[in-house]
Curated annotation (Swiss-Prot):
GO terms for cellular component: cytoplasm; nucleolus; preribosome, large subunit precursor. Residues 155-184 have a biased composition (Acidic residues). One of its GO terms (molecular function) is structural constituent of ribosome. Associated with nucleolar and cytoplasmic pre-60S particles. At the end of biogenesis it dissociates from cytoplasmic pre-60S particles and is likely to be exchanged for its ribosomal homolog, RPL24. This is Ribosome biogenesis protein RLP24. It is found in: Cytoplasm; Nucleus. GO terms for biological process: assembly of large subunit precursor of preribosome. The gene is RLP24. Residues 191-203 have a biased composition (Basic residues). Residues 147-203 are annotated as: Disordered. Belongs to the eukaryotic ribosomal protein eL24 family.
Length: 203
C-alpha cells in the first residue's frame, strides 16, 4: 500500500482518500482534504499557517535534523527481490521507528523544560502590575470558606435531625413495648378473675 504525503500540510494520504491535482506540466499535487486544496489554490504559504508540518519544522517545534529521518527518503533505485533482505529491512524499519519516537519525546521534553519557570515569572509580573487581583482572590477565598462552613453546618443539622428521629423511634418502640406488657398483664388479671368466679360458682 502506497501512502503519499499531503503537498500542503504533510499529513498522510491513504489510497482512495484525498484529492489529486495534476498541473499542465504533469506534476501531481496530492491533498489530504479540501481545506489543504483550497489553501493551495489561494497560494497560501504553508510556513505561515500554524497547523502545517512546515510551520512546526520552521518554528523549531519538531525534530528536523536527525539520522533517523534520512531513512524515510525516497530512493528510485530498483533492488532485486530477496526474502532475507525484506525480513531484515522490516526489522530495521521497526527499530528505526522506535528510535525516532524516543528522540522526538526527548526533543519535546527538552523544548518544554523552561516553560514552568517562565509561566511563574509571567504570573508574578501580572500580580505585581495588577495588585487588585489579589483582593479579588481574597474575596473568592472568603466566599469559598463561607460556602464550606455553610455546607458543614447543613451536614451537622442533618446528622442532628437523624439522631432525633432515631431517638423518637426508640421512645415510640419503648412505649409500644410498655403498652403491650400492660395489655398482657391486664389479660392475665382478667383470666385470673374469671377462674375465681368459676371456682366460686362451682362451690
Amino acid at each position: 500500500m502506497r501512502v503519499y504525503s499531503c503537498h500542503f500540510c504533510s499529513s498522510p494520504v491513504y489510497p482512495l482518500h484525498g484529492i489529486m491535482f495534476v498541473r499542465n506540466d504533469a506534476k501531481e499535487f496530492r491533498f489530504c482534504r479540501s481545506k489543504c486544496h483550497h489553501a493551495f489554490k489561494q497560494r497560501r504559504n504553508p510556513r505561515k499557517l500554524r497547523w502545517t508540518k512546515a510551520f512546526r519544522k520552521a518554528a523549531g517545534k519538531e525534530l528536523v535534523v536527525d539520522s533517523t529521518l534520512t531513512f524515510a527518503a525516497r530512493r528510485n533505485v530498483p533492488v532485486r527481490y530477496n526474502r532475507d533482505l525484506v525480513a531484515t529491512t522490516l526489522k530495521t524499519m521497526a527499530r528505526v521507528e522506535e528510535i525516532r519516537q524516543k528522540r522526538e519525546r526527548a526533543f519535546y521534553k527538552n523544548r518544554m523544560r523552561g516553560n514552568k519557570d517562565k509561566k511563574l515569572a509571567l504570573d508574578r509580573r501580572l500580580v505585581e502590575q495588577n495588585p487588585q487581583l489579589l483582593k479579588i482572590r481574597d474575596v473568592e477565598l472568603r466566599r469559598k470558606a463561607e460556602r464550606k462552613a455553610a455546607k458543614e453546618n447543613a451536614m451537622d443539622e442533618e446528622i442532628e435531625d437523624e439522631e432525633e428521629e432515631i431517638a423518637s423511634e426508640d421512645m415510640m418502640s419503648e412505649d409500644e413495648e410498655m403498652e403491650s406488657e400492660s395489655e398482657a398483664e391486664s389479660t392475665k388479671q382478667k383470666v385470673v378473675l374469671k377462674n375465681k368466679k368459676k371456682s366460686k360458682r362451682s362451690n
